[in-house]
Structures are given as C-alpha cells and as structure tokens.
C-alpha cells in the first residue's frame, strides 16, 4: 500500500496529468485514452515519462523498477510553472564546424592562403600577363568548363546515383563553384603558365557572381523548392576575391620592383603551403573521426572521386582541341578540376541547419581531398616522365639550331643574296685587273 499511496500522491497535482488521462472510479488508478499514442510509463527516477504504449495501470503490488533507457529519458512531463522533478541533463556538444578548434584552423588556413597568393603573385611576368589579357583564349576555355561542363556533370551524377536532396545539393554546389587556389600551386609545380593560371582564377571568381546563381537556379529545382540563389553568400564571394586579388597584386608589384625579394617570397610561400596542407589533413581527420566518415554513403565517395578527375580530363581535352601550348594545356587542366571548396562550405552552412545537413557537410572536404590527391598524382607523373620528355625535346631543338654542317652552310650561301651576285663578265674583269697589277 505504501507504493500505491506514493503513486497517488505523485499524481495529485492536476498539472502533471495529460489532457487525455482519465481516472477510473472503480479501479482507482489512472488509465490512458485508447486514442492517444502516448501513455504514462514508470520512470527510472523521480517524475513521469511519455512513451508510445496503448495503456497502463497502476497495481497495488510493488513492481520492479525498469532499467534506464534512452527513450525513457528523452521526453519528460513538464508541469506548468516550477516542477519538483528536475529534467534529466543531456549534454549538448556543438557540431565540429562550430568548435573553437575549427575556427582557429580557419584563421590559420586563411593566413597561409594569403602568404601563398603573395608568393604566386611574385611569379607573374607583367609582359606576358598583358598578352593573356589581350587574347583570353585559355581563360574562356576554363570558364566554359567551370560553369558549363562541371555543373552539368554534377547534376547528372546526382541523378545517376539517386542521391537524396541534401547530398544532391552539396554535389551541385561544389560543381558550380569557381576555381580554387590549389590550381595555382599545382600549375607552378608542373611548369605551367602562371600568368594564365592567375588570370583564370580571378576571372572565374568574378564570373561566379553571375554564373553561379544562374547554374544553381537551373539545376537545384529538381530537389528543393527554395531557390539557392537567395542563399548565395555574396560576402563570402567578395572575401574570396579580395583574398586572391590583394596578395597577388602585391606580389606582382614586388616582382616588378624587387626581383631578389620576390624569389625569396616564392620559396617561403611554397614551404608554408606544404606545412599548411599537412596540418590541415591531420586536424580535419582528428575533428571528423571514423564515425562521421563511415556515415557517408559509398555513392558520395564515388562522386567525390570522379568529379575532379572528369574536370581535369575535360580541361586538358578542350585545351588540346584548341591547340594551346603544352604549358597552357596543363594549366587549363588543373584550373578546371580544382574547385573553391571554402565557398561551397560557406553556402552549405547558410542553406541548411546543422542537424539537417549532417554528414553532407563533409562533401566539400572530400572533394578537396580527392582533387588534391589526383592533382598530386598528375604532378608526380609529370616530374617523373614529363620533364624528361621536355628536356629531350629542348635538346633536339638546340641541335637543330646549332647544326653547322657543310650542306647547310652551302645552302645558306646560295640563298644569301643580300649583297648582290657576281656575274661572268665581272669575274673576267676582276681577273684582268689582277693580271695587270
């Protein structure tokens, strides 16, 4: 009877009774309405919990206390005003992208990126830079691949692999972003045209203000009703543009005025970028952990691997079709496949709440990982085989320029008529004059 009296005492306040709970006069115990999916269940501690059950009653016999479960602790009966039964404390952990470690890492990466852009600006030759501005064939080809081929490829991959709404939009956003700064570094490592690379990065970022909303408006309507054009963070685009233009412009000025200082800055920027990449990969793996990586579907991994590879191939193929020089082909190739994943991450933060986006926040990081790995393989192949082929070709060109065989000299003498020719009559006259002397 003690347990029954305690139960009756606990149920006495009317504020603790749900609206659909009635008291049976015969049984003397509360019973839940059969139409409600929620019923009162015994709680492991003080207070009541709501759980899906058809009905429950209180018997005068003592019943054993069930073990605590996660479901019994999630929903509690909250009375009006102050309650004598405290709610169970549930620890709240912020998402990994909202932690102080991630914010500090973003600041570190941003500072290293500015140093890298300063060093890349020191590699620009002002004379060749103007030539690419007057004849922007490479920049137009990169823009065609960047905002024409890659968004269409991302759209088709999302349809082929039947991705859900969040995953499809994450893939589409990454495909519509402008070129990233990784292409500038990789172009430098493969002896590409740095003037063309920087022009392509700047122009694609400027074009993103117009073409990126257009691509999102065209392709995103297949999954969501809210136009992502309204969610485009113009502040993030402007910040990306400033972080690219200002250091590069300063680097060009240093190269123009102080040549030796520019060479030193290039070396420092390359080493700083190498250290930044190592720290970034280690810290990203530490923050994410294997559980979050395992929650990503396998189809998303396939898309993250195939997209940058297709971008590199399309850029190189289009540059070959238009008969660009070999160094420009490599530059267009790397610029097309390298995307600005920082901008994609910023849009995903604004487009979806953290609890809804979940592991799809990882797709830009996966894309950055695989585009860096594939570009690294491209650089490694070039360093192993491409440089040897180029050296052999340069040696052949030098041999042709320094060929001083008798046949070649004879042909040049016969073809050289800049000083006139000597006829037979002039030759007889010269012989007579010499005899007279």
Swiss-Prot record:
Cytoplasmic side: 125-140, 219-233, 289-291, 382-437
TM region positions: 104-124, 141-161, 198-218, 234-254, 268-288, 292-312, 361-381
Protein modification: Activated following N-terminal proteolytic cleavage by thrombin and/or proteases.
Pfam families from the UniProt entry: SBF
Coiled coil: none
Positions of disulphide bridges: none
GO cellular component: cholinergic synapse; dopaminergic synapse; plasma membrane; serotonergic synapse; synaptic vesicle membrane
InterPro entries, A to Z: BilAc:Na_symport/Acr3, Bilac:Na_transpt, Na+/solute_symporter_sf
Membrane topology: Multi-pass membrane protein
Compositional bias per record (Polar residues), positions renumbered to this chain: 22-41
Extracellular side of membrane: 1-103, 162-197, 255-267, 313-360
Cellular localization per UniProt: Cell membrane
MF-aspect GO terms: symporter activity
Biological process, per Gene Ontology: adult behavior; regulation of neurotransmitter loading into synaptic vesicle; response to xenobiotic stimulus; sodium ion transport
Composition skew (Low complexity), residue ranges: 42-74
Stated role: Transporter for bile acids.
Family designation: Belongs to the bile acid:sodium symporter (BASS) (TC 2.A.28) family.
Protein's name in the database: Sodium/bile acid cotransporter 4
Species per Swiss-Prot/TrEMBL record: Mus musculus (Mouse)
Lineage: Eukaryota, Metazoa, Chordata, Craniata, Vertebrata
